[in-house]
Amino acid sequence: MGAFPPPIDPSYIPSVSLTRLPATAPTADIIATLERDGALILVDLVSPQDVAAINAEIEPYIQKARAESHEAYDLIPKQTIMVPGVVGKSPTMARMAELDVIDTLRTRVLQRKCTATWEDRTEDFSIDPLLNSSLTYHISYGGPRQRLHRDDMIHGIYHRGGEYRLSDETMLGFMIAGSKTTRENGATMAIPGSHKWDHARVPRVDEVCFAEMEPGSALVFLGTVYHGAGHNSVPDQVRKIYGLFFIPGTLRPEENQFLAIPRSKVLGMSDKMLSLLGYKKPGTWLGIVNNGDPAENLAEVLGMANS
């Protein structure tokens, strides 16, 4: 993809900002903001104790990781450490993926409710969301900013413009701050309202604002929103972000969850997490093994797969 773009001029003053809502805000208010802006900041989503636990649980993997060890992501600079499969490495992060507010929002945005028509009847069913990826974005000093992009490009989504419908969205992300994030140390850039743009509309850096957050708050955004990690210009500071991204259960996850999460860990996970990882059959026949739901006897199914 070539060299990374230059930093945004420090004199630039955003003309827009991200709405901030408490994590305890009514779901209707959060959804209304997502529909309007495509992104917002949920304040105090994760407690200080849980942030500290996540940082401690992930630190050994950060120490082992090579900053440039993300060959599949050419839009990520080498100064960013990406630890993949975080829900399999941090029990606290796995628990965060099941927080009520996260569960409610991903269900509201990404659950697919469908009707099948048979020759003699109709049948309603639902397909629950899947975990698309869980990873770190730890940007060290000197890390350049990313190009502005949309995350839903991984599924080849084409944006036709016209009337906007939240039900058409194919990704919902939660970027949880593990440290104080500022414009200067690489806070994520985002363009509110860009989720409604058509495919031909090109983003400009004079349209961005910055997701500055205290530890435990989270940037929540749709896959249609233009965004990108910022430039870290602060010596001796690391911008720590933990990402949880979800997609409809009808799409293929970016991260291969069947291989990314150790099977020994999978067997101890909750039913909700098994569903998010794709081990549990939804309302249709997706994901069946031996003509049945693998989650009903997962140890036996995994044993068979390992034989």
From Swiss-Prot:
Signal peptide: none
Record flagged with keyword Oxidoreductase: yes
Cofactor(s) in the UniProt record: Fe cation
Pathway(s): Mycotoxin biosynthesis
Residues the entry annotates as binding Fe cation: H149, D151, H227
Assembly: Homodimer.
Keyword line: Dioxygenase, Iron, Metal-binding, Oxidoreductase
EC assignment: 1.14.11.-
Disruption phenotype: Abolishes the production of swainsonine but still produces the 1,2-dihydroxyindolizine epimers intermediates.
Alphabetized Pfam families for the sequence: PhyH
PANTHER family: PHYTANOYL-COA DIOXYGENASE DOMAIN CONTAINING 1, PHYTANOYL-COA DIOXYGENASE FAMILY PROTEIN
Organism the protein comes from: Metarhizium robertsii (strain ARSEF 23 / ATCC MYA-3075) (Metarhizium anisopliae (strain ARSEF 23))
Function, as annotated: Dioxygenase; part of the gene cluster that mediates the biosynthesis of swainsonine (SW), a cytotoxic fungal alkaloid and a potential cancer therapy drug. Swainsonine production occurs via a multibranched pathway and is dispensable for fungal colonization of plants and infection of insect hosts. The first step of swainsonine biosynthesis is the production of the precursor pipecolic acid (PA) via conversion of L-lysine (Lys) to 1-piperideine-6-carboxylate (P6C) by the aminotransferase swnA, the latter being further reduced to PA by the reductase swnR.
Top enzyme class: oxidoreductase
Family from the record: Belongs to the PhyH family.
GO molecular function: dioxygenase activity; metal ion binding
The protein's name: Dioxygenase swnH1
